[in-house]
Structure formats: C-alpha cells, structure tokens
Regions:
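A short, Lys/Arg-rich alpha-helix, primarily the initiator
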Residues: 1-14
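Residues within the helices of the helix-turn-helix
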Residues: 8, 19, 48
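The alpha-helix within a helix-turn-helix
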Residues: 11, 22, 51
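Short alpha-helical DNA-recognition segment
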Residues: 15-34
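Short, conserved catalytic or interaction motifs in soluble domains
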Residues: 37
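DNA major-groove recognition helix of helix-turn-helix/homeodomain DNA-binding modules
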Residues: 43-61
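Short, charged recognition helix plus adjacent turn
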Residues: 60-78
Length: 78
C-alpha cells in the first residue's frame, strides 16, 4: 500500500473527514488533499505532526514500514 493510501486509511479508521484530520494534525485542507492524492510527498515536519499526535501514534510503525506490533500498541487501521 502506498503512503497516500495509508494516510487515507488511518483517517477513515478514525472516522474523520479530511477537514477533521487537518484540524487535529495542523495541516491546511488543500495541502492534505494533495498528500492523499499523491501530488505532494509529505516532508519530515508534516510527518512528525502525524506520528507524534496522540490519536495517530498507534499507526506509526505501520505507516512507516507496513508492519505492526500489537504487543507494543502499534496497529494497522486496515
């Protein structure tokens, strides 16, 4: 699964709209839509906003590697 699809899967698993995700993560909606559409590659600063957010931390390992470690609280949204 490519990175953009993973972002979308995370957002949907949390039951969030794009606007709600952006509000939580601190992105503009226009920028986030470009991430989900694979038009922009997410840089370190933006990625850090996602993986350090308390609501999304549980997906960090999966987002970065595709792996999970449920025993460590690292899960997949799909």
């Amino acid at each position: 699964m490519e990175f953009a699809a993973k972002l979308k899967a995370m957002r949907q698993a949390e039951g969030m709209t794009q606007a709600e995700f952006c509000d939580q993560a601190g992105f503009s909606i226009s920028t986030y839509k470009k991430y989900e559409a694979s038009m922009f590659e997410m840089g370190y600063s933006a990625l850090t906003k996602v993986v350090t957010h308390p609501r999304f931390k549980k997906y960090t390992l999966w987002l970065m590697t595709g792996d999970t470690a449920p025993e460590c609280g690292q899960i997949s949204p799909v």
